[in-house]
Every structure is written in C-alpha cells, then in structure tokens.
C-alpha cells in the first residue's frame, strides 16, 4: 500500500468518523469554487460516455491561461501521473532528486529503472537549494526533479537560477514541480512555464487540485516543448482524465474571484500562523511561501511522531516529516487552514508543550 503522504485521515482505521481536523494535507481551506459543484451536477450524465481522450478543450484553455499552445500541454490524472509518465517516456539512465522533497519523484524514477541520486540539501543552510556545478559531474545524469516551491520546506528557487541550469545542461531534462505556485506571491519571479516552448529540456508540472480544492477528482497538467510532448504521448495511458474532472477544472480556472480571494487569504493567514508558531517555545517555523508551514522542533521532549499522536488525541492531524529523506523526527508540516481552525491548532500546541 502507498505510504508517506498526508491527507489519509478520512480513511484511517483508528480515527474514522471522529471529526479529525486535517492539517496534514495542503489543500485550499476554502475548498472548491461553488461553480464546480454546479457544473458537476449539470454535466453528471457525461459519465454515460467516454471522456475526451485528448482533453482538447481543457488543454486549449490551460494553454491560453499560461501562454502556451495546446500542443505543448498534457493533462493527467493528477500531477503524479505525469511524474511517472516523464521518466517512463524519456528513459533517463540516472536522475537527480534534491531532498527533502515530494517522495514520488524518486518513486517515478525507480519505476522506470533509472538510478536515483539523492542530493540531500544541508540542514544548516535551511535546506535551501543553491546551484553547484558538481551536481552534474556524473555524465549519466539525464533528468533532474526540482520542486518549486519545495514540499515540505517551502523554499523557492528564483527563475533565473533554474533557467541558467537548464541552459548550461542541454542534455539533461529538468522537471520542475510547480504544484503550489498559485499560492506564491509574485509567481512570475519563480515560474519557468513561459520558457517551456523554447527550451527542449524543460518540463513544468502543475496540479489543479491543491489550489482549487478538489484532490479527490485528480487532475494536473504539464507544459513542455512540442518535441517532448510527442515523445511522452507515446507512453501516456488513454482516458486517464474523467469527464467530470475535465469540466471541473475548466470551471475552476475561469473563477477569477475565487482565485483572487484564495490568494489574498493565504498571504494573510500563513503569516498569522507563522507568527503564532514563532511564539511557541521549542518551535522554529520556516517562513512560508505557499499554503503550508514547515516547522523545526528544538526540544528532545516532543519528537514529531509523538507530537502527531498527541495532536490526534485532540482531534488534529499534522504531517510528521520524519520519513522524508534528509529529515528526522525534529520536523513537521502543517497546512494553513481557516483562522478559527488555526487558532484551535495553536491553542492545542501550546497546551501540549507546556505540560
């Protein structure tokens, strides 16, 4: 069975139906746009037919949104399907993953029989990525996965740094995960999606379910040069994106009011949560850039696994980060939720750490 991710609370045997407040999964606390519910009901009978195998309308609309033609877009059953598709189609001998990060990068390389080089970023440098030419000394490295902003640390790599790497290593395919970029202030300083059409070794992958609040529907997309798209489409499963997910994504992307409201809320609320966590003795939160906060525990009395269990006893779930490569039981991650829910979390944490 799949392990090592947040968001399993609804299906947990021990805590089912106990009203757990889930801070373990980083999903928009506003949920989905109201129009998504409406459009799904209106189009529910679409399940009587096969979905559009090419996601034609959705690819065209996504292309318009990100400034790319539709033949440079692939839509998948969540971004994770696309992470597995990329190495399966391009067949790298070796791939680099900068750790700690999303575990499915390494799993995708493993499933394609590529050798994995885990470059663990330094704790004393706050796990920040800095470009080093030595990363690419091994000439068998043909693929690099980089999460921006990184999950779970929240670290951002500037656009110029990424593009410099891509240009200097034209024989390496760089896969940039921008799943949380919609939560970032001034995303144009970090996103490289506009450059995918002119750079034959750059792929940008994005999720449509985290920001728009419907992870149960599973939908994401990638943007890449048309030559790469042709190669990847040879290996992509047909009909992987259902009809309701396609119409939900179209509707969500059109909801400018929801997008604006969600971003403004997140910019304010994550700062509130960061400041409150900073006041708790024994915690050192990292400055958040997306919809989650990465926290270091500075006391030996409450490792992350124990903290997780104690919080579950109070009806709250967090993401224990001890199973991330490069981390230990001094780290956890929490999603940014509503003010009322965040207050409950902070109050419970203070109670637990002062006992």
Positions of PLM-derived features:
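Short loop-beta-helix segment that forms the pyridoxal 5′-phosphate
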Residues: 51, 63-85
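Conserved PLP-binding catalytic core of the aspartate aminotransferase-like
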Residues: 266-267, 280-314
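N-terminal "arm"/small-domain region of PLP-dependent enzymes with the aminotransferase-like
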Residues: 1-49, 130, 139-140
């Amino acid at each position: 069975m799949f392990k090592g991710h947040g968001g399993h609370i609804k299906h947990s045997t021990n805590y089912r139906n106990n009203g757990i407040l889930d801070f373990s999964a980083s999903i928009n606390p506003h949920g989905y746009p109201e129009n998504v519910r409406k459009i799904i009901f209106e189009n529910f009978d679409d399940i009587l037919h096969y979905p559009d195998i090419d996601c034609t309308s959705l690819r065209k609309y996504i292309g318009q949104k990100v400034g790319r033609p539709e033949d440079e877009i692939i839509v998948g059953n969540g971004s994770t399907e696309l992470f597995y598709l990329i190495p399966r189609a391009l067949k790298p001998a070796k791939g680099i993953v900068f750790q700690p990060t999303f575990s499915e990068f390494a799993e995708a390389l493993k499933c394609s029989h590529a050798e994995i080089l885990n470059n663990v970023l330094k704790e004393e440098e706050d796990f920040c990525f800095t470009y080093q030419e030595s990363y690419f000394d091994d000439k068998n490295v043909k693929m690099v996965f980089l999460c921006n902003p990184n999950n779970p640390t929240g670290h951002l790599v500037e656009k110029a740094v990424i593009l410099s790497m891509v240009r200097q290593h034209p024989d390496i395919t760089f896969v940039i995960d921008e799943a949380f970029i919609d939560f970032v202030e001034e995303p144009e300083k970090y996103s490289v999606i506009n450059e995918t059409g002119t750079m034959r070794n750059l792929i940008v992958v994005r999720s449509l379910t985290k920001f728009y609040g419907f992870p149960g529907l599973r939908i994401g997309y990638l943007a890449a040069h048309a030559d790469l798209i042709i190669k990847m489409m040879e290996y992509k499963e047909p009909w992987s994106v259902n009809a309701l997910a396609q119409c939900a994504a179209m509707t969500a992307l059109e909801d400018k009011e929801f997008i604006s409201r969600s971003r403004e809320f997140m910019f304010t609320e994550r700062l509130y949560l960061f400041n409150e966590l900073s006041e708790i003795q024994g915690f050192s939160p990292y400055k958040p850039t997306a919809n989650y906060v990465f926290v270091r525990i500075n006391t030996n009395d409450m490792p992350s696994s124990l903290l997780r269990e104690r919080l579950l006893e109070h009806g709250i779930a967090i993401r224990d980060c001890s199973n991330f490569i490069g981390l230990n039981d001094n780290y956890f991650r929490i999603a940014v939720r509503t003010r009322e829910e965040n207050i409950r979390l902070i109050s419970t944490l203070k109670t637990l750490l002062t006992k």
